[in-house]
Amino acid sequence: MILITDSAQEHFAKLLSKQEDGTQIRVFVINPGTPTAECGVSYCPPDAVEATDTELKFDKLSAFVDELSAPYLQDAEIDFVTDNLGSQLTLKAPNAKMRKVSDDAPLIERVEYLLQAQINPQLASHGGKVSLMEITDEGYAILQFGGGCNGCSMVDVTLKEGIEKEMLAAFPELKGVRDLTEHQRGEHSFY
């Protein structure tokens, strides 16, 4: 469910050594399955463990996950990264905003999941996003760009070289992608 790297375990072990005996960590998602989902880590003293919690045992600690957050923390990774600028704890949870769909789910659900879990987080760094409008009977995914992607001069490259390649690799049953957006260049446009 959750991978906690060795460096993150060391970091947590140091922090936990200064807490009440038996205190572990809790990993959770606030507003799971929504666009405003946020992940967090907190201390979990022994008296805060609920009967419905899942305990994940690691070499140096245990992480507790509440029943509601668990499906949204599938494939999550916690790491402690040190570089020239300092140290930072990172928590990546690709399923926090949308629950992972099964491989045999309808094509439209699998495409929507790929957009929300992999493509939109990349576009978000430019203030952009893409939405699935439909999948045609001919097998084309019809997309609409928003935010910084709307009116961006690089949108064709993003569509053909990025999104389409990724989607065709993941879904061979698709024939391609089409952009439905009426692009309006403005201050909101990234390029």
Curated annotation (Swiss-Prot):
The keyword 4Fe-4S applies. GO terms for biological process: iron-sulfur cluster assembly; protein maturation. Pfam families: Fe-S_biosyn, NifU. One of its GO terms (molecular function) is 4 iron, 4 sulfur cluster binding. Binds 1 [4Fe-4S] cluster per subunit. The cluster is presumably bound at the interface of two monomers. InterPro entries: Fe/S_biogenesis_protein_NfuA, FeS_biogenesis, FSCA_dom_sf, HesB-like_dom_sf, NIF_FeS_clus_asmbl_NifU_C. [4Fe-4S] cluster binds at residues 149, 152. Its cofactor is [4Fe-4S] cluster. Keywords: 4Fe-4S, Iron, Iron-sulfur, Metal-binding. Belongs to the NfuA family. Homodimer. Involved in iron-sulfur cluster biogenesis. Binds a 4Fe-4S cluster, can transfer this cluster to apoproteins, and thereby intervenes in the maturation of Fe/S proteins. Could also act as a scaffold/chaperone for damaged Fe/S proteins. This is Fe/S biogenesis protein NfuA. It comes from Erwinia tasmaniensis (strain DSM 17950 / CFBP 7177 / CIP 109463 / NCPPB 4357 / Et1/99). The lineage of its organism: Bacteria, Pseudomonadati, Pseudomonadota, Gammaproteobacteria, Enterobacterales. The gene is nfuA.
